[in-house]
UniProtKB/Swiss-Prot annotation:
The protein's name: E3 UFM1-protein ligase 1 homolog
Region (Disordered): 396-470
Alphabetical GO biological process terms: protein K69-linked ufmylation; regulation of proteasomal ubiquitin-dependent protein catabolic process; response to endoplasmic reticulum stress
Pfam family, one: UFL1
Function text: E3 UFM1-protein ligase that mediates ufmylation of target proteins.
Family note: Belongs to the UFL1 family.
Species this chain originates from: Aedes aegypti (Yellowfever mosquito)
Keywords: Transferase, Ubl conjugation pathway
Cellular component aspect of the GO annotation: endoplasmic reticulum membrane
């Protein structure tokens, strides 16, 4: 190992000697490469190859070349450019640059660049020159100019050379701003001059634009120079307000308030005041101010309003508040002021419409006629039936159907029970001999149920079925109320308030009219119930009489031959059967609130009543109408008639034979009385044969004139030959008279003969006595 090291030393010495030798004997390039390669292999020599591999250099030599290049480039060099210039790999250059920075503190490595102190000093001189020219400089601008970080420039250049090379001052509020004292002095003078010339509130932005001063510098200096005014804030929209202007504002506000007792917000805002209400409060601390929307009023004006209100209440008149308040006050301001001024007692005695205050006593005197109108209309609605219809619709709308049916059914059952008791203890075969028919347990149709309704919608249940429109009745209109009010307000010049007052009083009078209508309705209902009971009893008697008449007439019809009976039955049902059916239909129509005008009903009218009536009447009434025209016998009709009476809760009285004999006797006397007063030949003959038939058979007969010949044929056995001849001749003359009406000569002759025979015919009928007993029994 020692021998090797000695050999290396010898070779190195030879190599050095050869290099220093001036001799022409030099090593060849190949030998040099071999020697260097051997040294590198042995670790005795460290070299750096160039990028093209043709040259190599040592680490120290590369460091020296980097320093030399930094100097040549003026103290700032980029490593990328340096690597190209030195023809050395970038990584090698970067490592050497880092080594140089470590060895020399004056050299800085920033963003891939090497910078030395000479560069810093040169930049500092440039910054100082620029600062002297502009008066102000920002590190951010230097960053853009020199392409270096702001913090690096600030710490290594600006602050390092401040007051050495860079003659300036750092801004206390912004460390990146530097300015010269002369610049500050000039700016302060500009600001002082501009503010001194301002006499009204001016935006700070306008001042800055005029002076050309940054807002930052203005905010820093304004407190030092603004001795004649103040800046509202440091925001972009700030204003400068001179003290002279603020004094003018305060003087104007105080003087105006002292003279008028109020302040308009728009006028105060026009003085440049932003927060008007606080400004007024601050400038008038001792005054009791009420802030409204458009203005602020003082105690003096409020006292004036209160005094006027008290005078108005004491005199029972009205007050237009706008006449004592400033014209600039809006309706909203007036409402707000009155709500503060009016006490609870005052509010009960007044009505307020806009700016007009009316006392209730003043309005009551004017509106008195409306009470009479409401009562009159209520009476008219009850008399016309419109109120009853309204109550029925209202009940149908709000009451549950099951409750309505059960309630109505119970009411109907009570009425039937009352009628049965009355009939059972009343006239015409009543008492223990009365025949009571069973009534069907059916629900009655829904009608007004007038005893269970209220005069106010508020009392109706709200849980009823909904759908459709609610029942409505208007007993008094706003126009009628307004007309009355207008007549009373017109002398005072307040007719414009009539419609508003009418709207205010309409619910009151509408409720009053409904209450009055309900009161009258209850009275009429009580009277109607009494009349209904009386009518029901009288109709029951009338229908019983018709029923008995038809039954008694049937006995007379049964005495005739079978071929004649159908004609007589048809005529009896068409006349008395129709009367019976009409009476039943009239009753049902009244019970179901159906329209049935007139004293008689046609077939169509009866059928219409059947279709529209309640279900409990429909089947019985339909069968009755059909039986009038289609019954084969009187018994069939009487069965249907009995069912109809039962459906109408009427009692069919028990047959009384003694009463039947009295009825037949009365019927005969009635016919005799008609005969005595009759002069028409055809009617004389008709009455005569009916009287003779009644006397012969002790039965009644209901027949028309066309049945006289059949009755005469039936009576032939009961008549003497002379009587039969006389009646036959009289009958023939009547037929001739009816057929010879066109020939006046024949009519006169026949009429003369009839006049001669009429007394004889009347005598036969009035003096006739039966020769034997022929009875329907």
């Amino acid at each position: 190992m020692t021998s090797d090291w000695d050999e290396i030393k010898r070779l190195a010495a030879d190599f050095q000697k050869a290099q220093l030798s001036t001799s022409l004997q030099r090593l060849s390039e190949r030998n040099c490469v071999e020697v260097v390669s051997l040294l590198i292999e042995k670790g005795l020599l460290e070299v750096i190859f160039t990028t093209d591999g043709k040259e190599y250099l040592t680490q120290a030599h590369l460091a020296q070349e980097v320093k030399d290049e930094l100097f040549v480039q003026g103290g700032r060099v980029n490593l990328v450019d340096l690597a190209k210039t030195l023809n050395v790999d970038f990584d090698r250059v970067q490592r050497v640059a880092e080594q140089v920075v470590q060895e020399d503190p004056s050299v800085k490595f920033v963003l891939g660049q090497l910078l030395d102190v000479s560069y810093f000093e040169r930049v500092a001189m440039e910054v100082n020159e620029k600062l002297a020219q502009a008066g102000e400089i920002n590190v951010a601008d230097l960053t853009m100019q020199y392409d270096l970080p702001a913090d690096f420039i600030l710490s290594n250049i600006v602050l390092k050379y401040l007051n050495k090379i860079i003659m300036g001052k750092q801004d206390a509020s912004n460390a990146n701003i530097f300015f010269t004292q002369s610049y500050v002095t000039r700016s302060k003078a500009k600001i002082r001059g501009a503010l001194a010339a301002i006499t009204k509130p001016t935006p700070v932005s306008a001042i800055l634009a005029q002076c050309g001063i940054p807002d930052r510098l203005f905010n820093m200096l304004v407190n030092e120079v603004a001795t004649l005014g103040s800046v509202t804030s440091r925001s972009p929209g700030a204003q400068y307000i001179p003290h002279i202007y603020r004094k003018t504002q305060v003087d104007w506000v105080q003087n105006f308030y002292r003279q008028n007792g109020y302040l308009e917000h728009d006028s105060v805002a026009g003085l440049g005041v932003t927060d008007v209400k606080n400004f007024i409060t601050n400038q008038l601390p001792e005054a009791k101010i009420i802030h409204l929307k458009k203005c602020s009023v003082g105690e003096k004006l409020i006292d004036q309003v209160v005094a006027s209100l008290e005078e108005c209440l004491s005199s029972n008149t009205y007050l237009d508040v706008s006449t004592i308040l400033p014209s600039i006050m809006t309706d909203e301001d007036i409402d707000q002021l009155l709500s503060m001024v009016l006490t609870a007692a005052m509010q009960k005695q007044t009505l307020i419409f806009g700016s007009t205050i009316l006392t209730t006593k003043f309005v009551d005197d004017i509106i008195k006629p409306c009470y009479g109108i409401a009562e009159e209309h209520a009476k008219r609605s009850v008399d016309s039936g419109s109120y009853q219809q309204y109550m029925a619709e209202k009940l149908m709308k709000h009451q549950d159907p099951m409750d309505r049916d059960s309630a109505v059914g119970e009411g109907k059952a009570d009425k039937r029970e009352e009628r049965r008791k009355k009939a059972a203890g009343g006239k015409g075969g009543g008492g223990t001999q009365g025949r009571e028919t069973k009534t069907k347990s059916t629900k009655k149709h829904v009608r007004g149920q007038k005893g269970n309704v209220s005069d106010s919608d508020d009392d109706m249940p709200s849980g009823g079925k909904k759908g459709g429109k609610d029942a409505v009745i208007e007993l008094i209109t706003t126009k009628e109320i307004a007309k009355v009010l207008e007549a009373g307000l017109e002398p005072e010049g307040l007719e414009d308030l009539s419609k508003q007052l009418a709207q205010h009083y309409y619910p009151q009078f509408s409720k009053l009219a409904l209450a009055k209508a309900h009161q009258l309705y209850e009275i009429s209902l009580h009277q109607s119930n009494q009349n209904r009971r009386q009518t029901h009893a009288s109709l029951q008697d009338k229908l019983n009489n018709l029923y008995n008449d038809i039954r008694l007439y049937e006995k007379g019809i049964k005495l005739f031959p079978a071929d004649v009976q159908p004609q007589l039955v048809k005529y009896l049902l068409k006349s008395l059967g129709t009367d019976f059916s009409n009476e039943i239909c009239f009753y049902v129509a009244a019970e179901c609130n159906l329209n049935s005008n007139g004293t008689t009903l046609t077939v169509e009218q009866r059928n219409k009543i059947v279709q529209e009536c309640s279900q409990e009447y429909k089947s019985a009434l339909q069968a009755l109408n059909k039986a009038v025209f289609s019954s084969a016998s009187i018994d069939d009709f009487l069965d249907v008639a009995e069912s109809a009476l039962q459906a109408c809760s009427m009692i069919l009285k028990k047959i009384d034979k003694k009463k039947d004999r009295n009825l037949i006797l009365c019927h005969k006397h009635g016919l005799l009385e008609q005969l005595a007063n009759c002069s028409d030949p055809a009617l004389v003959l008709h009455l005569a044969v009916l009287i003779i038939f009644t006397i012969c058979t002790q039965s009644m007969l209901h027949a028309s004139g066309r049945h006289v010949s059949s009755i005469l044929s039936f009576l032939q056995p009961q008549l003497s030959p002379e009587q039969a001849q006389t009646l036959t001749s009289y009958h023939d003359l009547v037929l001739k008279l009816l057929s010879a009406e066109g020939s006046s000569s024949n009519v006169d002759d026949i009429t003369k003969q009839l006049e001669d025979l009429t007394p004889t015919v009347k005598s036969i009928a009035s003096s006739f006595k039966k020769s034997g007993v022929t009875s329907a029994e």
